Amino acid sequence: MHLGLLALALVFFSSMGHADNLKASKARRQRRISTEVPPSCSNGCEHCSEYNGCLKCRPRLFILLERNDIRQIGICLAACPVGYYGIRNRDMNKCTQCKIENCEACFSRNFCTKCKEGLYSHRGRCFSSCPEGFTVNGTMECVVQCDLSEWSPWGPCMKKNKTCGFKKGNQTRTREPLQVPSPATSTGAAPASGCVPEIQTQRCTVQKKIPCKGENKKNQQNRGENSKNRGRDSKERGGNKKRKNTNRSTTVPTITTSMVT
């Protein structure tokens, strides 16, 4: 009797194992069929599968692989999201995650463009404070520390590099660096962009129009020629009047012919 019960138990467990194997093989077969027959791809995708999403994006788009448990699902984007940078290849454009320490956004594998909150950006890296010889600006970037002089007086009012012959122009003033940065702070890949002269420009109005030097002689010559022309015109008008009066005083003799009978 015990042997019969044992045999029945073995048959039962073997049938259960066979059923589980059938279910697993059926699931694998359905998964293989779903990958072989491509479903309708999302926007911007050329080749895709139901299990892994997009496999190849259209040209000019980037593929981003998002992890979902043990799977990686591909999606197509026009630009990589924050924390990733784009790599363009002939076969496919990919979004690669930034791996620079304390970096939120990067331009390439070795250059960070935005650090985490409270940190300062310097030459593509993130620091808790700016290096010696540098100071922070309004965008949390370390720039060359540079002291500038006071503003110079406003320059003359000019237009097209001239100080005459106009009514309105521009004038400028500058302030220069008080000292040149040391080589230790100005050498390297990044230029000393913070230590440069500053220039301000404003509109100006000339109270009295100043003629240029050449314009005075030209104006005098023009006035002389105009006076000569006026004198010549007056003489010509006087001669014409005399000739008209002479013509009026001269009488032409008339000849009268009569008949004698």
UniProtKB/Swiss-Prot annotation:
In the record for this protein, the FU repeats are positioned at: 34-86, 92-136
Disulfide bonds listed in the record = 41-48, 45-54, 57-76, 80-95, 98-106, 103-112, 115-126, 130-142, 146-195, 157-164, 204-212
Xref: Pfam families? Furin-like_2
Q: Name one GO molecular function term.
A: heparin binding
Give the highest taxon in the source lineage: Eukaryota
Amino acid composition bias (Low complexity), ranges on this chain: 181-194, 247-261
Q: Where is the signal peptide?
A: 1-19
BP terms from Gene Ontology = angiogenesis; hematopoietic stem cell differentiation; positive regulation of canonical Wnt signaling pathway; positive regulation of Wnt signaling pathway; vascular endothelial growth factor receptor signaling pathway; Wnt signaling pathway
Glycosylated residues are 137, 161, 170, 247
* Chain intervals for the UniProt region annotation (Disordered): 168-194, 212-261
Q: Which GO terms describe its cellular component?
A: cytosol; extracellular space; Golgi apparatus
Name the chain's protein: R-spondin-1
Q: Which organism is it from?
A: Danio rerio
